[in-house]
């Protein structure tokens, strides 16, 4: 297991066909974007995530504790993902969490992981002297008067006046070489009464920040940059009768993110684009610098952004529950069963942002009397407060009829008929809805020859009423050559399988707005959903 706080990063290079792209190192926000066989559609190109048989968000997947997971499988081709119809165009990630097994005594597992997070590559930056030489060459090539005299170049080179002619490596000034990450997990699994099986898991993750000067930040605001996450999961299986199995799954997640008022991505953007000669970190009197003899002040001091621009706190509470019942219907025909899933998820978010500006001054040298000259650049303000709260709710109903039977020890037939409906709502808005039916039939002979057909008829309300549903068929065939007696293989080859498939899948993530089909286009429009002509 990779010691990562975000599950998506643990999959990098582990599954064929899965591409992971990590774009941030901010604690709690370092998830990778996932793509199966690259970008395949317009709009959203992320795969559908299915956890224990039910669709979930990629955030739910990202924040899973790796110790809860039994297996992760990706469905890449149209045949395997067509059951998901209108949501399957970008492939499917199927996650199965751990469940209890029959054992005489409970199995208790405790895991501790400590990790060091370190940027593997940062941009190389010029020094102020190297920058000045480039400006000198540019002026010479353009036939312009050189902006830096030889005397000024010597001062910059020697660093004899770091306040008027600063040379600041902002990466070294703002970022630490590494930060710590801690993970703790405890699992308990077992059985009772011969009918009950359980798996219970609890975990805690803490990510530190790569930003320096956290003692100053904590002194100013009484908070510390961090990411904390608590995970809980309970999977219980009950054999109510010899024909009826009941499954009760509960899961929860509590997250807290704290950081400077300026978002981490903005901090990184600032230090990436800031010139080494733009300003000193501090002036001779200890105030924050703004501008220099080489550049007039027009941007905020990165040190002040990290330590004195305010702070944010983000709390996320997620609770989900799934109730499932599976009943064997062998009295109708052997291998037939019916299964019902009902799942509910509630996500509560509370974001608080408190921002302020800070004092900074442009040091312009000394006057004739030797007094330092300072020009105010920014003035400290009171903390402003912005609060936002919202709730997301998901309900999912799934009804399945399954058939799985083997005849004469070589002919295996399996089939499934499935109907489902998903509702997602945020605060008091009308819920988003998905619904559809799908079926699958598969045959294999002697585990050598495989045939499969899938049909999906799924709908999304992101489309006009008469165009919400689509028909998604698929077919596949496979042949395990390595099991043929007439083929002799060397010992180092264990499996050769040919497989071909064809199918149709869809994608309804075509835009950020909900009912794109009623977007208005009006001359002179300025409101959202209108187009400005001319």
Residue positions per predicted region:
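Membrane-proximal, glycine/serine-rich, low-complexity loop/turn segments characteristic
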Residues: 1-48, 54, 61, 67, ...
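Short acidic loop-to-helix transition motifs that present clustered carboxylates
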Residues: 27-29, 55-57, 78-80, 422-424, ...
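Extracellular/periplasmic, surface-exposed regions of secreted and cell-surface proteins
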Residues: 46, 182, 235-244, 250-254, ...
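A generic structural signal for short coil/turn motifs at secondary-structure boundaries
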Residues: 58-59, 81-83, 174, 209-211, ...
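Conserved residues at the C-terminal ends of beta-strands
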Residues: 75
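Active-site-proximal polar cores
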Residues: 359-360
């Amino acid at each position: 297991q990779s010691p990562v706080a975000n599950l998506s990063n643990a999959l990098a290079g582990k599954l064929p066909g899965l591409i992971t792209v990590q774009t941030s190192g901010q604690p709690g926000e370092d998830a990778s974007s996932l793509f199966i066989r690259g970008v395949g559609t317009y709009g959203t190109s992320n795969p559908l995530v299915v956890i224990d048989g039910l669709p979930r968000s990629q955030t739910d997947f990202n924040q899973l504790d790796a110790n809860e997971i039994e297996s992760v499988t990706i469905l890449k081709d149209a045949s395997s993902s067509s059951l998901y119809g209108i949501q399957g165009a970008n492939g499917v990630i199927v996650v199965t969490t751990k469940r209890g097994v029959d054992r005489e005594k409970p199995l208790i597992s405790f895991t501790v992981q400590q990790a060091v997070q370190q940027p593997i590559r940062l941009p190389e930056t010029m020094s102020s002297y190297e920058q000045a030489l480039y400006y000198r060459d540019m002026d010479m090539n353009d036939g312009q008067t050189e902006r830096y005299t030889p005397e000024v170049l010597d001062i910059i080179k020697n660093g004899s006046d770091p306040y008027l002619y600063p040379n600041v490596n902002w990466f070294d000034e703002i970022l630490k070489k590494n930060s710590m990450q801690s993970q703790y997990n405890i699992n308990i699994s077992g059985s009772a009464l011969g009918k009950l099986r359980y798996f219970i898991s609890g975990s805690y993750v803490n990510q530190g920040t790569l930003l320096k000067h956290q003692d100053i930040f904590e002194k100013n605001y009484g908070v510390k940059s961090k990411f904390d996450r608590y995970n809980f999961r309970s999977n219980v299986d009950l054999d109510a009768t010899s024909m009826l199995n009941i499954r009760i799954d509960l899961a929860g997640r509590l997250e807290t993110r704290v950081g400077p008022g300026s978002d981490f991505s903005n901090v990184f953007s600032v230090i990436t684009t800031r010139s080494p000669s733009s300003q000193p970190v501090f002036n001779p009197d200890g105030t924050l610098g703004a501008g220099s003899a080489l550049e007039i002040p027009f941007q905020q001091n990165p040190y002040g952004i990290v330590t004195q621009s305010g702070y944010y706190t983000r709390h996320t509470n997620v609770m989900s529950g799934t109730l499932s019942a599976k009943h064997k219907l062998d009295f109708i025909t052997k291998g037939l069963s019916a299964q019902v899933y009902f799942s509910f998820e509630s996500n509560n978010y509370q974001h608080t942002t408190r921002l302020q500006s800070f004092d900074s001054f442009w040091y312009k040298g000394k006057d004739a009397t030797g007094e330092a000259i300072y020009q105010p650049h920014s003035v400290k303000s009171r903390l402003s407060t912005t609060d936002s709260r919202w709730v997301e709710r998901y309900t999912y109903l799934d009804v399945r009829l399954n058939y799985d039977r083997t005849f004469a020890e070589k002919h295996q037939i399996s089939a499934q008929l499935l109907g489902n409906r998903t509702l997602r709502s945020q605060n008091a808005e009308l819920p988003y809805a998905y619904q559809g039916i799908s079926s699958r039939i598969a045959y294999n002979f002697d585990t050598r020859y495989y045939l499969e057909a899938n049909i999906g008829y799924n709908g999304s309300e992101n489309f006009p009423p008469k165009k919400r549903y689509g028909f998604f068929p698929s077919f596949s065939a496979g042949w395990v050559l390595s099991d043929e007696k007439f083929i002799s293989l060397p010992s180092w080859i264990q499996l050769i399988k040919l497989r071909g498939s064809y199918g149709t899948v869809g994608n309804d993530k075509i835009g950020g707005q909900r009912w794109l089909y009623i977007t208005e286009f009006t001359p002179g429009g300025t409101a959202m959903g209108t187009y400005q002509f001319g």
